UniProtKB/Swiss-Prot annotation:
PROSITE patterns: ZINC_PROTEASE (PS00142). A motif (Dileucine internalization motif) lies at residues 727-728. One of its GO terms (biological process) is proteolysis. It comes from Oryza sativa subsp. japonica (Rice). The active site is at 315 (proton acceptor). It is an enzyme of class 3 (hydrolase). Dileucine motif seems to be involved in protein-protein interactions. GO terms for molecular function: alanyl aminopeptidase activity; metalloaminopeptidase activity; peptide binding; zinc ion binding. CDD domains: M1_APN-Q_like. Binds 1 zinc ion per subunit. This is Aminopeptidase M1-A.
Length: 878
């Protein structure tokens, strides 16, 4: 289009910025006013104009830009050009700058002065509140992913517009100022200092970071001299030591794994008190929630330690996969997040092999499975046409299904081939952008396998298959259909990498199943079938992202194999998880699921038992609605099942115990408390009362505190609130975020609806940071779901004004999804009809679908003729 024909109108309502001008370098100066919660700034952008134009169009949001503060100087020109008009388009978050003259093709410098507010929304350039010597103070922090750099300075705020950044900050002289690169020079002028940072390599805007506040740090160096620091609030630096150790090891490991050195001279990691996500991988300056970075030897639990290790590894993986090689557009977000999730487990397994993290990884797959079994799921590669849609795809599909299909592919291609091909991919696309197809091409070239064909069915369409298996005349008959939790028939078809073993792991079969149906002649099958202990397991060690449904004969054989401890931990997990999902979808009876649970009575592996517990609690919630008269019997069966484990592991750690024992102890005791087990509740209350008097008592170590708090809340009601008040007192007194989160996660587990309501109100008080509301919401117990839904409707206007992004979607999903009747589903549909904006549309749809699925499960359970007898029978038999 000729420059003369351009008009401002054509740039409105577009998903992407026009391509006729691109930034090459930003000289950015920011002056934050910490007390006044505002900032001013100026940016000089070297712009490459590639086609004649009278317009420059870039992103800006919530910034004040006056036309007098904008000018453009073509390279080599005498005179700068002043715009005829500067239009701010808030709904598109763009700035349209119109000149009377046509800008010549080539480089020029665009200068813009601007002002903004240090907001309290945890995105853009924002303020976070902390205490120093008993006084509340503001720090200035940035959070730009996915599209909020535009809230700090005008820029081309899309991942493919990579540029160099030279940053200068003017800040109070006593503060610490950090950015992506090391400081080159500081000039102090009385109360203010100017801090000049080294130029960055070529990078995307969403990875730029700036932080100003008062901090301490701990420091170490990698073997090749990269400086690593963990910054904390003043007085908390000792809590950064564990993360520092992990970071140093991780940088060394990834340098080897990706065959490319870490590209920057330093790595800073910092804990931010108010932080919306878990962490953010800004190049060279990674920001974290306190709970994901700090570890207190005395008061943090084993689960906290694992969380820190995995999150640090995840964020540092991004320094290569995301920062050095960046997705071309948000459609390919999964490349960033799925990959970093997968490789963070690879790192954790490398440093802590005794944690069995690859078995724990199955929890990630399960979360992906649950979301992807909804009709309202989305493909891994999802079209993004508006900036408001981006936040919602930071979900279990991009992270967890993404990680699971990468693991499936690595397992199919082999670890070595996979690693070499990745290194080639990173080398080829370093300092630029890539699409999903580029990764497939690199893996195809390295392996000689048809990776693109194999993977298209997993990333371009939503959902996943269930493979139905029957044994007939010495042949395995297999059929694949799309699995949906609603029990409906989906239409998808996949190229499924099948692995199977028969009677032992010594011989495995592998093949691609890409038809609808296939018969498989297993040469050793007839021989194997004659054995008394015959069994067949598909999806060996659960490396594939699909479910398996066995005919009755094969299912009972697997139950035997579990009882006889013939299956690996991952396979024991998989059989249970698949059976539970099939039961929920109405494809199997609840009775057979309960019989299967009984087969795990000698289970030894933490992750498998945690899955048994999770499944059991979810059955309890459903039976409470479907067959309340049988609830007591069901709880008795589950308590009788779990009690021997609890007696064995006890409340107190024994010498020689490991990390997984600590995780199991907390999970097991919490479950018994939730089931109303009196002995557990009484012991918890006894220990808690001692803890209230003496916070240093060894009787309530961090690993069992959550269990004790949940148990305590089972004793609370509106006329006896002592336990609740004691917990609130501890909450207010502790300055350890992990302790605060433990308490928040327990408060709403109370069976009294009035108390649940009070805890929800407390969550919106200034006592609870906005970011932490999700922990309280997740902790709402079975008795509180309807109260929480009524409460959400009443408070919706306030909540939707106060919370944004992922936090707002959490309010919807955690409150709506657990409801279990069609009436509730109708109510939610009606309520959100007039209240759904683009940023929550997907979540609302998915949550209401979950309610429908729950209601259907309740109905199919009610219809099970012999359920009452079975509940009676199992509660006596075991």
């Amino acid at each position: 289009m000729a420059a003369a024909e351009q008009s401002a109108e054509q740039f409105r309502g577009q998903a992407r910025l026009p391509g006729f001008a691109a930034p090459r370098r930003y000289d950015l100066r920011l002056v934050p006013d910490l007390d006044g919660c505002a900032f001013t700034g100026s940016v000089d952008v070297s712009v490459d104009v590639t086609a004649p134009t009278r317009f420059l169009v870039l992103n800006a949001a919530e910034l004040e830009v006056s036309p007098g503060g904008v000018q453009f100087k073509p390279h080599g020109a005498e005179q700068e050009l002043h715009p005829a008009e500067v239009t701010n388009v808030p709904e598109d978050e763009i700035l349209i700058i119109r000149f009377n003259e046509v800008l010549p093709v080539g480089e020029g410098t665009l200068v813009i002065a601007f002002k903004g507010t240090l907001n309290d929304k945890m995105h853009g350039f924002y303020r976070s509140v902390y205490e120093l010597n008993g006084e509340k103070k503001n720090m200035a922090v940035t959070q730009f992913e996915p599209a909020d750099a535009r809230r700090c300075f005008p820029c081309w705020d899309e991942p493919s517009f990579k540029a160099i950044f030279k940053i200068t900050l003017e800040v109070p002289s006593e503060t610490v100022a950090l950015s992506n690169m090391p400081v080159v020079e500081e000039k102090v002028n009385g109360l203010i200092k100017a801090v000049y940072f080294q130029e960055t390599p070529i990078m995307s805007t969403y990875l730029v970071a700036v932080i100003v506040g008062m901090f301490d740090y701990v420091e170490a160096f990698t073997t090749d001299g990269t400086r690593v620091r963990v910054y904390t609030q003043v007085g908390k630096s000792a809590q950064g030591k564990f993360a520092l150790e992990v970071a140093v090891k991780t940088l060394v490991l990834f340098k080897e794994y990706f065959a490319v050195p870490y590209p920057l001279p330093k790595m800073d990691m910092i804990a931010i008190p108010d932080f919306a996500s878990g962490a953010m991988e800004n190049y060279g300056l990674v920001t974290y929630r306190e709970t994901a970075l700090l570890f207190d030897e005395k008061h943090s639990a084993a689960a906290n330690k694992q969380r820190v290790a995995v999150v640090v590894a995840h964020e540092l993986a991004h320094q290569w996969f995301g920062n050095l090689v960046t997705m071309e557009w948000w459609t390919h977000l999964w490349l960033n997040e799925g990959f970093a999730t997968w490789v963070s487990y690879l790192a954790a397994d490398n440093f802590f092999p005794e944690w069995n993290v690859w078995t724990q990884f199955l929890e990630e797959s399960t979360t992906g499975f649950k979301l992807d079994a909804l009709a309202g799921s989305h493909p891994i590669e999802v079209d993004v046409n508006h900036v408001d849609e981006i936040d919602e795809i930071f979900d279990a599909i991009s992270y967890r299904k993404g990680a699971a299909v990468i693991r499936m592919l690595q397992s199919y291609l082999g670890a070595e081939t996979f690693q070499k091909s990745l290194a080639a991919y990173i080398e080829k696309f370093a300092y630029s952008n890539a699409k999903t197809e580029d990764l497939w091409a690199a893996l195809e070239e390295g392996s000689g396998e048809p990776v693109k064909t194999l993977m298209h069915s997993w990333t371009k369409q939503q959902g996943y298959p269930v493979v139905n298996v029957k044994l007939k005349d010495g042949k395995l008959e297999m059929e694949q259909t799309q699995f949906l939790s609603s029990g409906a028939e989906g239409v998808g078809q996949w190229v499924v990498p099948i692995t199977l073993c028969c009677c032992s792991y010594s011989r495995q079969e592998k093949f691609l199943f890409n038809g609808k149906q296939e018969d498989f002649n297993l040469s050793g099958l007839v021989e194997c079938q004659k054995k008394e202990d015959f069994w067949i397991k598909l999806n060996v060690n659960q490396t594939g992202f699909y479910r398996v449904s066995y005919d009755e004969e094969l299912a009972s054989r697997l139950r035997y194999a579990i009882e006889a401890n013939k299956l690996s931990a991952a396979d024991r997990y998989g059989v249970l998880d698949d059976t539970y999902a099939l039961c929920m979808a109405g494809k199997q009876k609840l009775v057979s699921l309960l019989h299967l649970i009984a087969a795990y009575k000698d289970e030894t592996e933490y992750t498998v038992l945690a899955r048994v517990i999770d499944t059991s609690l979810s059955i309890v919630e459903m039976v409470a609605v479907a067959a309340p008269e049988g609830l007591g019997k069901l709880k008795k069966f589950l308590i009788d099942f779990l009690e021997p484990f609890a007696q064995r592991i006890g409340w107190d750690a024994k010498s020689g115990e490991g990390h997984l024992d600590a995780l199991l102890r907390g999970t097991l005791l919490t479950a018994l408390a939730e089931l109303g087990h009196e002995a557990t509740i009484n012991e918890a209350v006894r220990r808690f009362n001692i803890f209230v008097e003496d916070r240093e008592t060894p009787l309530l170590p961090p690993d069992v505190r959550k269990a004790a708090y949940v148990a305590l809340m089972q004793t609370v009601n509106k006329s006896n609130r002592a336990g609740y008040e004691s917990l609130l007192k501890i909450y207010k007194e502790t300055d350890l975020s992990q302790e605060k989160v433990r308490i928040l996660g327990s408060l709403a587990s109370c069976p009294d609806p009035d108390v649940v309501r009070d805890t929800l109100d407390f969550m919106l008080s200034p006592e609870v940071r906005n970011q932490d509301s999700i922990f309280l919401l997740r902790g709402v117990g079975a008795a509180g779901h309807e109260v929480a839904w009524t409460w959400l409707k009443e408070k919706w206007d306030y909540i939707s004004d106060t919370f944004s992004g992922t936090l707002l979607t959490y309010f919807v999903s955690t409150t709506v999804s657990p409801l279990r009747t069609d009436e509730m589903g109708d109510d939610a549909e009606e309520f959100f009809k007039s209240r759904t904006k683009a940023n929550i549309a997907r979540t609302v749809k998915q949550s209401i679908e979950r309610v429908r699925i729950n209601a259907k499960w309740v109905e199919s359970t009610r219809a099970e003729a012999n359920l009452g007898n079975v509940l009676k029978e199992i509660s006596h038999d075991h």
